[in-house]
Amino acid sequence: MTSSLLQRLGIALPIIQGPMTGSDTPALAAAVSAAGGLGMLGCGMRSPAAMAEAAAAVRQQTDRPFGMNLFVQATPNPDEATVQAAMERLAPLYAELGLQPQRPTQWCEDFAAQFEALVALRPAVASFTFGILDAAQVQRLHSAGCTVIGTATTVQEALAWAEVGADAVCASGLEAGGHRGTFLGDFTAAQVGTLALVPQCVDALAPQGVAVIAAG
């Protein structure tokens, strides 16, 4: 992370909290920001209303900059046959645990609605995982005063983020815990470790002036 990026983000320490969707809290994000790093809210599973509530909670606890992260994903719309087949496959597991099968009423949050909420909330940083924005979306965030950070697992993905206007790229290597954010090409092509991926991305993005952040 470069000193120019630190100045742009308004933080004293080169530390960005992992968004950790599902296990983060506004209190944690506020504490990290108050300590000189950049606190983050993982909003991939938050509704627009929940995003607004979480952002307000952070702002009540600190006046320091913080960021919000979204999953770039299409909202699934499986047909009835697919849902029924899945329920039948899961039925024995529910029975083994003595539970009644619960038919899903929602598959994930609607990204378009989340994105609109993000623009309206105007956090210092808007970051993204599992996909990529288009240039118009990045421009809307810039107009709202947000620094845009994209996640990349390959140099190809890092260059794609630079092409649409991202300010920084978070280079996430093979060691990423739990899941990968690969969105271009096959997962098997994204087997580079973070310590190797970071300098590769730095070299590739230097001509565009795009900063590189090493993922944890």
Where do the model's predicted regions map?
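Glycine-rich adenosine-cofactor-binding loop
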Residues: 209-216
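Active-site entrance/lid segments in N-terminal catalytic domains of soluble metabolic enzymes
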Residues: 1-209
